[in-house]
């Protein structure tokens, strides 16, 4: 039991790393297809990932020590089907006239190991039927393939990292794990009466995807800035006469001003999140509206505080009266506070799906392009 606790703890430690790798593609997929991220779907998907990770750790770990690994030179296989039944009977020590000995059937190691293998795959079948909407035949095949993946991994010594298998390839494990997946498929059937169906979850996602959430804006902007950074690096030889920050500014302004004209209102970030820039009067904005929109956006949110800061510093340098230092510091603090309140107000308005100042002045807005399937 202690070994299982250690392995489970290792899965908990690895989970954040797996989540970090998986999250960005998952967010991109959901926003592109549904236009939103539903918390219940996130819970289901991430619990499925955590389950698979625990399953992997339980089957693969612990790895052999270096001393043990040095002795591994063969690939062991047990190919007799249902041998586990013979093992259970052999270790049961049942005396028909003594009912208490019947418990040895379920309390011996051979039985417990196979029960663990059975229940290990039960959630897999449940997830496949409920969330992924797989049929019985698909669940059977996928459960078999999952078990086969683990057995081959063990047989090959983590795909020949080790010179031999450190665990036994057992055909009974294939049988029991596959039965576990089928059992999970059967168990979740009655529960689907009370659980929201996958179609219902998708319907809610599509409905929410018609609105432009603050997080959706942030995700779109994140992808855009990532692409801009890549373009800046790749185009650096063509703009070597400019400072790297100036080159970044040129690429940024060109990206947000020209690309939407060519794509009828979409940047790469918009495409990923299934959004587009449209005119507040309907249709496509005038060509200069894209430039105005992002000139105002970057000018107010990024450059204005820098210029204000520089102006205050120049003013303080000109007026070197030490007795007024506290007053200058107070002015700086008040300006910073006002700017913070402005950002806070803007964030609240975006969260409430209100039009922002640069959208009103450029007569543009962000609109969802999600197609309900």
Question: PLM ranges: what are they?
Answer:
Residues 1-165, 182-273, 279-373:
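Bulky hydrophobic segments
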Residues 168-179, 330:
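Individual transmembrane alpha-helices with interfacial aromatic-anchor signatures
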């Amino acid at each position: 039991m202690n070994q299982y606790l250690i392995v489970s703890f290792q899965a908990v430690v690895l989970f954040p790393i797996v989540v970090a790798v998986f999250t960005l593609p998952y967010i991109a997929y959901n926003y592109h297809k549904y236009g939103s991220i539903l918390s219940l779907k996130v819970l289901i998907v991430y619990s499925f990932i955590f389950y698979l990770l625990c399953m992997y750790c339980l089957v693969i770990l612990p790895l052999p020590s270096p001393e043990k690994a040095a002795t591994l030179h063969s690939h062991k296989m047990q190919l007799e089907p249902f041998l586990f039944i013979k093992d259970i009977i052999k270790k049961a020590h049942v005396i028909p006239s003594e009912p208490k000995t019947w418990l040895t059937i379920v309390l011996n190691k051979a039985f417990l190991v196979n029960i663990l293998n059975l229940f290990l795959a039960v959630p897999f079948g449940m997830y496949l039927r409920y969330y992924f909407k797989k049929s019985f035949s698909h669940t059977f095949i996928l459960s078999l393939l999952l078990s086969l993946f683990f057995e081959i991994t063990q047989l090959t010594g983590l795909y020949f990292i080790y010179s031999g298998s450190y665990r036994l390839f057992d055909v009974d494990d294939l049988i029991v794990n596959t039965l576990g997946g089928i059992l999970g498929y059967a168990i979740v059937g009655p529960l689907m009466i009370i659980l929201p169906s996958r179609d219902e979850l998708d319907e809610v996602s599509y409905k929410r995807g018609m609105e432009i959430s603050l997080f959706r804006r942030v995700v779109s902007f994140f992808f855009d800035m990532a692409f801009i950074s890549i373009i800046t690096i790749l185009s650096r030889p063509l703009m070597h006469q400019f400072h790297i920050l100036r080159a970044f500014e040129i690429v940024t302004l060109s990206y947000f001003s020209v690309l939407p004209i060519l794509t009828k209102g979409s940047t790469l970030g918009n495409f990923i999140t299934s959004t587009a820039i449209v005119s507040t009067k309907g249709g496509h904005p005038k060509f200069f509206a894209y430039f105005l929109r992002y000139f105002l956006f970057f000018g107010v949110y990024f450059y204005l505080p820098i210029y204000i800061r520089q102006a205050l510093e120049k003013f303080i340098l000109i007026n070197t009266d030490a007795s007024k230092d506290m007053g200058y510091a107070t002015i700086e603090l008040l300006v910073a506070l006002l700017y913070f309140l402005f950002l806070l107000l803007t964030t609240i308005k975006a969260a409430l799906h209100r039009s922002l100042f640069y959208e009103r002045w450029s007569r543009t807005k962000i609109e969802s392009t999600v197609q309900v399937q």
